[in-house]
Amino acid sequence: MANIVFKLSDKDITTLMSRISFDTENLPQGMKARAKYQNTTVNIYQSGKVMFQGNHAEAVSEELLPQHSQLNTNKTKKKNMANSFLEQTLMYDQFNCIGSDEAGSGDYFGPLTVCAAFVTKEHVPILKTLGVDDSKKLTDTKIVELAEQLVTFIPHSLLTLHNEKYNIQQAKGWTQVKMKAALHNEAIKNVLEKIDSSQLDYIVIDQFAKREVYSHYALSDIPLPKKTKFETKGESKSLAIAVASIISRYAFVTYMDQISKNINMTIPKGAGAKVDVIAAKIIKKYGLSRLDTISKKHFKNREKAQKILKPL
């Protein structure tokens, strides 16, 4: 199935929407309008990007956006030439892969989020056009923009371990490695239920532990062990991992924004000195028990925040 993306001005989007009938209600977050036309899905996003999906995507885009279609084709050819070496080095992008990654493990505040995503060879050009990259290189704003588009067409599973449950499991002796292994394995199994596994070439996990350690903590067997690979710096080696990273980071960032609104403070990410100061302010205003509902209790920040409040 072909996927073609354009970046349009508000004027061009208005013109496009006047040419065929679009639905504008009950749409996923981040989507402005959607239409079905000649066996092709046309998605218009709030970001100004328009995606054509389907076997006739190219023909439909040429019909509805004749001028832009030709410009986009020329740009794509140039970009493909520039990326030719990159495509040779990214082996996994030549195959249909499930990638998995997590967010929040190094942050005192907020949950642990894990995503697994299925990316096919056909998805690769559209993902590159959208600008999918290592989430650590992307701003939070860009992550939100990308994720809201990705979740509309990439089969995925997103799991969130909220702080209260996280702290309960940690108190029982669960390490972060055990939590992540269990969540990654569950997310991967969820995605396998959504796809035809005969089309799957590899499962690529952004490595946080060696295979034997992962297998020990995963709570259940690795679904397809012969197809499963563990890669350090996986986001730079597999677009499937990059997509999973963006979606998991999106969930984490969104939750952090919600925490900030709920307590009327800007909650910093990470586990540095700024985090200690904000944690101390939360204890002073709301109490230690409230702090524990939005943070990971075993981090040293909790102790440091309490020391800040002690009189000199």
UniProtKB/Swiss-Prot annotation:
SUPFAM superfamilies: Ribonuclease H-like. Keywords: Cytoplasm, Endonuclease, Hydrolase, Magnesium, Metal-binding, Nuclease. Residues 95-311 form the RNase H type-2 domain. It holds the Pfam family RNase_HII. Its main location: cytoplasm. GO terms for cellular component: cytoplasm; ribonuclease H2 complex. A divalent metal cation binds at residues 101-102, 206. Its cofactor is Mn(2+); Mg(2+). Endonuclease that specifically degrades the RNA of RNA-DNA hybrids. Belongs to the RNase HII family. RnhC subfamily. This is Ribonuclease HIII. It comes from Staphylococcus aureus (strain NCTC 8325 / PS 47). The gene is rnhC.
